[in-house]
């Protein structure tokens, strides 16, 4: 490498570091947030989304962790977008780790970056996702399930692995299984998915019952209908809420009686759901 090329490379790295410092300052400025913030930040973020900026990976990962800990989804997603563009497949682990701590369900942009990485590097993606499924950390297992449902759309290859996790000791993991089996992933084995969801609707943990009951809304057979009617006696208001919605477009006096009970429920959200279903 010539002295001129070395000088040019050093100058480019210096410029990228200044751009990252500017991004830090703007992310810390509350006046930069608000309507149109994404568009205002895009030029600076795009400037950093270059493989030349890969040398900044350790600093970007530290910033990502800080924004995740601060529950700042806007800053987190800007840094994650930079990290994915600059580092490619090497950013996968950090972005998956950030997904584990998405406490505000604001991870849509982060998910889009992960989906792009999954498409570009499928072999490394499935390796990391499978490792997540086998992790001792329940949060990591949840993200592993999410990743499998994305990569194996329709459950053709990994349905059994996810289905077996319906017996996971952690209720949040079991709840994730219920919502996953209620999605298109469940077509990998519809009878088993249905059986697991029915069992999930009787799980001791309310978060599992909620997701199972919500997922059973598309099953209109008598067994499922009777189960949803029985949810009028569930002690968890969100189970009752989802049961009311899942009883939509089902005939019969027992369904009508259950909806009338939901419409008189002590919880306002349950009452509103039942009244909407009843018309």
Cite the ranges covered by each PLM segment.
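Eukaryote-skewed repeat-based solenoidal scaffolds used as protein-protein interaction platforms
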Residues: 100-167, 172-183
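Leucine-rich solenoid repeat scaffolds
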Residues: 256-279
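Amphipathic alpha-helical scaffolding segments comprising HEAT/armadillo-like alpha-solenoid repeats
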Residues: 10-28, 51-67, 88-100, 121-134, ...
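Alpha-helix N-cap/helix-start positions at coil->helix boundaries
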Residues: 32-38, 69-73, 104-108, 138-139, ...
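Alpha-solenoid HEAT/ARM repeat scaffold
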Residues: 38-42, 58, 77, 93, ...
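N-terminal alpha-helical scaffold/docking segments in eukaryotic complex subunits
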Residues: 1-77, 81-85, 249, 272-279
């Amino acid at each position: 490498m010539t002295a001129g090329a070395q000088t040019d490379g050093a100058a480019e790295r210096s410029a990228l570091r200044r751009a990252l410092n500017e991004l830090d300052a703007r992310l810390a400025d509350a006046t930069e947030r608000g309507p149109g913030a994404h568009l205002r930040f895009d030029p600076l973020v795009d400037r950093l989304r270059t493989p030349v900026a890969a040398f900044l990976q350790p600093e970007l990962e530290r910033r990502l962790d800080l924004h995740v800990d601060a529950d700042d989804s806007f800053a987190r997603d800007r840094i994650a977008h930079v990290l994915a563009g600059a580092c490619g497949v090497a950013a996968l682990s950090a972005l998956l780790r950030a997904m584990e701590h998405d406490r505000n369900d604001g991870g849509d942009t982060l998910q889009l970056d992960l989906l792009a990485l999954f498409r570009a590097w499928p072999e490394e993606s499935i390796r990391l996702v499978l490792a997540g499924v086998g992790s001792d950390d329940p949060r990591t297992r949840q993200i592993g399930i999410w990743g499998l449902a994305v990569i194996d759309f329709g459950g053709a290859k990994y349905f059994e692995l996810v289905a077996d996790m319906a017996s996971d000791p952690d209720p949040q993991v079991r709840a994730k299984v219920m919502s996953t089996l209620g999605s298109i992933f469940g077509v990998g084995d519809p009878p088993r998915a249905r059986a697991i969801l029915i069992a999930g609707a009787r799980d001791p943990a309310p978060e599992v019952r909620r997701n199972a009951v919500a997922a059973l809304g598309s099953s209109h057979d008598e067994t499922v209908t009777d189960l949803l009617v029985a949810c009028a006696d569930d002690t968890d208001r969100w189970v009752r809420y989802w049961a009311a919605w899942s009883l939509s477009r089902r005939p019969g006096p027992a369904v009508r009686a259950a909806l009338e009970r939901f419409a008189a429920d002590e919880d306002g959200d349950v009452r509103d759901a039942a009244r909407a279903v009843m018309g």
